[in-house]
């Protein structure tokens, strides 16, 4: 969420009024087919991940009712491979029946093959002992992807806890992205109290968007405190969110012309049992992949606004890095 908190400038309102997401139209170029990359994994000895068949491929995303599917729309395509298995997939759908020239991307990730690390920003939430605000060291040489985290803490209605330090106190009931020392990630309503042993980070943002497979009743609320202040107080903007499926796989959605309701629908279509909204507005939302060696960054889609190299130097905002499991990143 942008740094103005509850104040949206007159210029932003005018800009949105002059250039809102267009209605109708078609997707320029259609659904892209990504070229999957092979992510580095240890080669010494058999791994549990390579020995098991892994989670089943998710069902295709549901195209909004009333739209004839585009070629490839909603179909999962391989994005990364590890140990001969698909480590990540991506699928795209149009957000609704009105904004038909836009696509929302959903990335599916297998935690048996990938691990997740939360990085604090220099300003959001501020410095955390033992944690870097950029990709560096060994992680930089193996990182496969990064994605944005949540709102500024003053707007998040929740807290930030990492490496034993409550930078901002955790709030019971808040939607929480919980990361463990083994690189696992879960999404839950915080039960209260201190994090359990093995938890290394908790990032909270608003209430749950999806709770036990049910979309929050307030997704159509016009109260900006519920789901965040958008540029020009607009409903249809760039949004992002994260969810975890019943099999433990992780899904991240990101795209333009999204309302809270259509973001929730995309995550639910991807099978999310629990999900939360992450940051919103075009300047803050992105999913970035990296080619190795060299951590060469690429935005997942060309319409993303933030620079692809935003996390290769100190970041003001916190973010999540994704690396191959077993690389020690």
Predicted segment positions?
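Short, ordered beta-strand-loop transition motifs
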Residues: 95-101, 181, 246, 314
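C-terminal regions of proteins
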Residues: 284-329
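C-terminal soluble interaction/assembly domains
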Residues: 251-253, 260-292, 300-302
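Aspartyl protease catalytic domain
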Residues: 113, 118-269
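Zymogen propeptides
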Residues: 1-169
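Short beta-strand scaffold segments in enzyme catalytic cores
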Residues: 105-108, 175-179, 240-244, 285-288, ...
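Short, solvent-exposed loop/turn segments at the edges of secondary structure
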Residues: 102, 172, 237, 313-317
């Amino acid at each position: 969420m942008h740094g103005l908190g509850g104040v949206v400038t007159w210029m932003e309102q005018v800009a949105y009024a002059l250039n809102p997401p267009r209605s109708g139209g078609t997707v320029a170029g259609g659904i892209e087919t990504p070229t999957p990359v092979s992510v580095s994994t240890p080669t010494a000895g058999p791994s549990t991940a390579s020995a098991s068949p892994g989670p089943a491929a998710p069902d295709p995303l549901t195209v909004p009712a009333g739209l004839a599917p585009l070629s490839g729309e909603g179909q999962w395509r391989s994005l990364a491979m590890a140990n001969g298995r698909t480590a990540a997939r991506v699928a795209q759908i149009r957000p609704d029946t009105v904004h038909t020239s836009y696509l929302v991307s959903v990335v599916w990730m297998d935690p048996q093959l990938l691990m997740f690390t939360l990085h604090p920003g220099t300003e959001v939430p501020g410095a955390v002992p033992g944690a870097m605000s950029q990709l560096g060291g060994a992680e930089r040489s193996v990182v496969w992807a990064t994605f944005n985290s949540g709102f500024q803490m003053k707007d998040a209605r929740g807290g930030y806890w990492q490496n034993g330090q409550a930078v901002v106190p955790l709030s019971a009931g808040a939607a929480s992205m919980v990361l463990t020392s083994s690189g696992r990630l879960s999404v839950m309503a915080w039960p209260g109290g201190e994090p359990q042993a093995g938890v290394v980070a908790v990032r909270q943002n608003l209430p749950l968007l999806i709770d036990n497979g049910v979309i929050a009743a307030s997704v159509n609320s016009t109260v900006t405190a519920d789901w965040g202040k958008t540029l020009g107080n607009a409903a249809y903007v760039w949004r992002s969110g994260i969810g975890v499926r019943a099999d433990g796989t992780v899904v991240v959605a990101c795209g333009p012309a999204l309302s809270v309701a259509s973001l929730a629908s995309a995550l639910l279509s991807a099978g999310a049992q629990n999900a939360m909204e992450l940051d919103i507005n075009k300047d803050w939302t992105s999913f970035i992949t990296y080619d190795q060696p060299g951590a060469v960054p690429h935005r997942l889609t060309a319409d993303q606004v933030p620079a692809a190299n935003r996390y290769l130097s100190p970041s003001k905002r916190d973010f999540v890095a994704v690396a191959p499991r077993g690389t020690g990143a």
